[in-house]
A protein has these predicted regions:
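Conserved ABC ATPase signature
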Residues: 135-139
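Conserved structural motif at the start of ABC-family nucleotide-binding domains
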Residues: 6, 21-23, 78
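Conserved ABC ATPase "signature" region
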Residues: 101, 105, 113-131
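ABC transporter nucleotide-binding domain
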Residues: 175-256
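Catalytic Walker B motif of ABC-type/P-loop ATPase nucleotide-binding domains
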Residues: 160-164, 169
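Helix-to-loop junction immediately C-terminal to a conserved catalytic motif
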Residues: 51
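Conserved ABC transporter NBD signature motif
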Residues: 59-70, 76-77
Length: 293
């Protein structure tokens, strides 16, 4: 059995004169890798490259040892890959079951009984077993995201590419989905781009931070979070001298400083704190606005 893997070597992608990715080198093995970065960092472009929806302008991409630029090998990758794009187009009038069944048929699940059983399985995984007969257009945004995730989970693929899978999903279901992804990641490569830094902290051992198309950080989540140790504290007023400061739900301000401070009472840093510190405080956290796209 070949171990699931993805490799990128000096990968770049341009759109006309605009550079979306430059010099990206990554090796991805089974497990969940979180992808963070500000708007326009190149995250969605990177996911589309991994999902074979877009070719690189330079460099080499290999998925499961196959070259997505070779048509026959690209077809082989797509048969073994689950992809949930940031935006999913649903055909008018389709129910959740009909849509996932349609995708399963496209993926060559030709035996009707086995296909229907698999559709029921993935709908159950995402908490939609009771809503299979509901028309997708009548669903909430979070339910639609779960339908999109269900089709990506068909066949427990060795590679799973997810762009904002938990957007609009309620907290209880997000916990359920984390459990599903953690189980799949025991044998599959899962790449997860999300606004929710708490999803990355809960699910991922590894995080990649993109900025302006380049990798700013690639390593353990715990190491990145540790970089903010001794640099985070709560105060009654914002501190203009720190890298980032925002008002929390309690009314106090959470301050993140570029250097350790010994004149304040520190609090345990979060991944969000460390992410802001890495970016020099140039973005605000989810509690006050978007961190990443």
């Amino acid at each position: 059995m070949v171990t699931a893997s993805i490799s990128l070597r000096d990968v770049g992608r341009t759109f006309g004169a605009t550079r979306a990715l430059a010099g990206v080198d990554l090796d991805l093995k089974p497990g969940v890798t979180g992808l963070l970065g500000p708007n326009g960092a190149g995250k969605t472009t990177l996911l589309r490259l991994l999902a074979t929806a877009l070719p690189p302008s330079q460099g080499k991409v290999r998925v499961l040892g196959l070259d997505p630029e070779v048509p026959a090998e690209r077809t082989g990758i797509r048969r073994q890959l689950g992809y949930q794009p940031q935006e999913t187009g649903f055909p008018r009038g389709f129910t959740a079951f009909a849509f996932v069944d349609y995708i399963a048929l496209l993926k060559e699940w030709t035996q009707p009984a086995a296909r229907r059983a698999e559709v029921r399985r993935v709908l159950d995984l995402v908490g939609l077993s009771d809503l299979g007969a509901k028309r997708i257009r009548a669903m909430s945004g979070g339910q639609r995201r779960r339908v999109a995730l269900a089709q990506a989970l068909l066949g427990s693929p060795p590679v799973l590419i997810l762009d904002e899978p938990t957007t609009g999903v309620d907290p209880e279901q997000r916990v359920v989905l984390r459990t599903v992804l953690a189980e799949l990641a025991r044998t599959s490569v899962v790449v997860l781009s999300t606004h929710q830094t708490e999803d990355v902290a809960a699910l991922c051992e590894r995080v990649v931070v993109l900025d302006q198309g380049r990798v700013r950080y690639d390593g353990p989540v715990i190491d990145l979070t540790g970089q903010a140790a001794g640099r985070v504290w709560l105060a009654d007023e914002p501190d203009p001298a720190v890298s980032a400061s925002w008002r929390t739900g309690t009314g106090r301000y959470r301050n993140v400083a570029a250097r350790a401070r010994d004149d304040v009472e520190h609090v345990e840093p979060s991944l969000e704190d460390a992410y802001l510190l890495l970016r020099g405080g140039s973005a605000e956290p989810e509690t006050a606005g978007e961190v990443a796209s």
